[in-house]
Amino acid sequence: NIGKSIKLKDFLFTDRFKGIAEDIRQKSTPDERHEYKKTKVHEIPAITISGLFNVRESKGLVSPSGLMCIDIDHKDNTPEIMAKVPSILKSLPYVCYSAKSISGDGYFAIVPIENPYHLRQHYLALEEEMKSYGITIDKSCKDITRLRFATYDDEYYYNPFASSFYLEVDITQPLDRKQSNQFVSSSTHSDEDRV
C-alpha cells in the first residue's frame, strides 16, 4: 500500500468514521468488538502520527512530526482507572488531543514532544508519568512507525495551546530508567497546523 500525506486535523476532526465506530461499539464484548474491527480494517484508514515516511519503517522516516501518540487500553487498566482517563488526560498541559479508540474500549492521546528524534525516551518518561495516575500505556507506542486508526468521538478533547513534553536529562546519552520520570512540560504552541 502506498500512503499519502494528509493534514492531521483532517484526520482527527471528521465524522466520516462515525458509522463504522458505532457498528463496532454495538458489539457486546471487547473480544467481539476486536474481532469485528478486524473484518472492517480495510475500511478504516490509519496514519503515522509521529512522522512522515517514504516507507513505514524507522529508516524510512522523512521528517518527524514532533508528536507522540499513546494508547490507553481496557486490557491493561482497571474499569475504575478507565473511567477516570478522559478527565486525567484533559488535566495534563501537554495533551493536545484525546479521544476514544474506534472500538470505544480505550483512549488515545497526542502529545507534542520537545525532541522528536528521541521519541522512545519521551515515551519512557511519559510512561512513568502515567503510572503516577495509575494508568498503563501501550508499550508499542514507543515505535515511531506506529499506526493510529481513524475513529469517531463526539466528546474528543482538543487543546491547541498544549505545551511540549520534554526530558530534563541529556538525551544525547542513553536514558537511565531511574531518570526517566524527570520531565517538564513547556513551549506553549498555538499553531493549528500542528494538529
Give each language-model segment a name:
Residues 24, 28-37, 89-93, 126-134:
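Hydrophobic, Leu/Ile/Phe/Ala-enriched alpha-helical segments that form helix-helix packing faces
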Residues 68-71, 97-100, 108:
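Structural recognition of the beta-strand scaffold that forms the well-ordered cores
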Residues 1, 54-77, 113-195:
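DNA replication initiation modules
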Residues 1-66, 76, 178-181:
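DNA replication initiation on ssDNA origins
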Residues 58-63, 90, 98-103:
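Short glycine/proline-enriched loop/turn "hinge" motifs that connect secondary-structure elements
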Residues 77-94:
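Short amphipathic alpha-helix segments
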Residues 97-103, 138-143:
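Short beta-strand
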Residues 105-111:
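A generic structural motif
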